[in-house]
Structure formats: C-alpha cells, structure tokens
Amino acid sequence: MIILNGNQLTLDLLMKIARDHEKIEIDLESQKLVEKASLFVKDIAMHDEPVYGINTGFGHLANVRIDKKQLSLLQSNLLMSHACGVGDPLPIETVRAMMALRINALIKGYSGIRLETILKMVEYLNLNIIPVVYEKGSLGAS
C-alpha cells in the first residue's frame, strides 16, 4: 500500500502504481486539506460576489453570473465540454500513472474538489477500473 500526501510521489512509486497495480491510500492530513478547500469553494459559490468559473461563465461569458440553482449544471456542462479524444486508446499503465498523478496533485488541497470525488478516483484505481483515454485531443483542466 502506497500512502499519498501530494508531496512524496517518486517515479519509482508511480511505476509501482502504474505497472504493478500497487494500491494507494490518501493520508489523513491531505484529506483534511481537500475538505477545507472544498468547503471554501462551496462557501464562495453560495455568496453573491462573482468568482470566475465558480459562479460565472467561462471565457467570453466570464461576466455572466450563474444562478445558484444552475451551478451544478454549469459544472456538468464544463465536464461535457472537455469530453473529447481521438486516436488509439493509451495503454492502461499510462492511464493508471495519469490517474495517480492527478490524485496526487488534487490532494494538495488547492483545487476545491470534493474529497468524495478523489476517494472515488482512488477506489477505481485500486480496483483497476480505468477509463479509456485517447492518444490525441484529450483535455485537462484544474
């Protein structure tokens, strides 16, 4: 079992996760950081002050305020707008490494993502439930 904290993932450990299917876990301090950031973002979303990408549109719609009732739809639409990819699927070990790297970055507590989402990513990685990621055109965002 490899315990991730966002700061100590080495190439050797990453290869154990990607190639050897070593299971991972998130340390408690990192979980607290994620929860704190998530609550901060949730609090911002519920206030009237506009904050880009949380309760406003994106890009040229940055000045458009999104109603509180539509915030969940805004986030769903953002995910759908990034769902693209062409070419051959990447090898599973590459995607496993990508998942581990993403989890490791998210547990630093800077994104505002919910802990439940990260724990689900960990569960999927540990169960070897791996998404198809295509070699060209995949997008990523914080």
Regions inferred by a protein language model and the residue ranges of each:
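Conserved, well-structured ligand/cofactor-binding cores
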Residues: 1-142
